[in-house]
Structure formats: C-alpha cells, structure tokens
Amino acid sequence: MMQEIKAFNEKRAEIYWWLSSLFAKELTQEELDKYQSMEIRAFLTGLAENDALRPSVNAFVDALNRLVDRQDAQLELAADFCDLFLKTAKHGALPYASIYLTKDGLLNGEPAQKMDAWLKKHGVQVNQQLNEPADHLAIMLDFLGNLIIRSNEFEQDRHMEEAFIEQNAFIQEMLLSWLPSFSQRAAEYDEFGFYNSAIKLLVAFCMLDSDYLVG
C-alpha cells in the first residue's frame, strides 16, 4: 500500500512540476515540439481518463492542435505569455497570489511572505533563474512538487497522513484561494486560449488532488 502511495506521489509531483514549467517562462521551439510528441500526448490522454480533468485536458489538447496551424506559433505563444503574465495587472493575468488576495493588489504582499515562510520551513531553494517574488505561481507549484516528493521518505502511515494534511492545507490556502480569480482573468485576456486552458487544468487538478488528500 505504501509503495502504491509513493508511486502515485511521484506522478502528482510530476504534474505540478510540469504545470510549473508552463508558467515559469516562454516555451522554446524545442519544448513546443515535445508537446506534439507521442509521449506527451499519451500523458495527456492518461489525464483525460479522469472525469474531473477531462474537459480541461480536452481544451488544452484543442489549443495544442490549433498551434500546429498557427503561423509563427512559438513567437505568437511567447507574445501571449508576455501579454498575460509580464505586463500589467490591468490588462493581463499576473501570476502572483498577492495581486488577487490583497486589497491594494500590489506585488510582494502578505501571500509572498507566507510563501517565504513555507520555503524556509522546508528548506526548499527556489529556482534562482526565476528571480520572482515567492508567490509567483511557478515557484509555488515547484515547491508543492518538492513537498510531495519529500513525503516519500516516510515509512509510517501516520507520517504520510500528516504530510497529506499539510499538502492539502497548502493547496487550499496558497493556491485555491486565488487560482479561480486568476483563471477568470486569463479567460478574459487570453484570446488564443493555450494558457487559459492550462490554468483551467491546473485548477481542476488542484481540486481533484485536494479531494484525494482528504479522502
């Protein structure tokens, strides 16, 4: 039983790390090519076997299929990334918890400090290349992947149960507290829909994962 849980933990971490990579930086041509590979398509087909994920996975696959016919797809997708995530909160969907959870909607608010506390508590080093406040979505998802993998060091059921409680608290307090608002913003400004569909998939996966952790 414990081995099955650990194997599933590896899959969960892998999904969070994959989603983190989507929000960390623009996709290169090489990375984009991989999305059309059999391996990635099989991975997405596997995710779509879950009823809760199927609609958002299908929307993401639809965006991938449309990318094949999109002129200068890599450049256009990089422009989408820039417009959505790097410009202004007024005309995009900035990927920071502070934007959505503080009254003034400014960067480096209380959510960033809370995230710093999570990182320090677990001694996790974030990707230095990101050079972003701690409540950037890519950092938060990368951290969650690390939190999950670290729990695989446990051998006793009660320790794993405690780890599940902590992981669920992180998902609820640090992610699902603002991701639906972030998703609404992205839906408003992402005309092509690649990143919007990725965010919807992330929200669906967080909700599903939370149900698994408390189940």
From Swiss-Prot:
Entry keyword Zinc:
no
Which cellular component terms (GO) are annotated to the entry?
cytoplasm
Q: Name one GO biological process term.
A: protein complex oligomerization
Q: Which Gene3D superfamilies match?
A: 1.20.120.1820, HscB, C-terminal domain
KW Metal-binding (keyword) present = no
Q: Where in the cell is it found?
A: Cytoplasm
Q: Keywords on this record?
A: Chaperone, Cytoplasm
One Pfam entry name: Nitrate_red_del
Functionally, this protein is described as follows:
Involved in the biogenesis of TorA. Acts on TorA before the insertion of the molybdenum cofactor and, as a result, probably favors a conformation of the apoenzyme that is competent for acquiring the cofactor.
Similarity field: Belongs to the TorD/DmsD family. TorD subfamily.
Under which name does UniProt file this protein?
Chaperone protein TorD
Q: Which organism is it from?
A: Vibrio vulnificus (strain CMCP6)
Supply the source organism's classification.
Bacteria, Pseudomonadati, Pseudomonadota, Gammaproteobacteria, Vibrionales
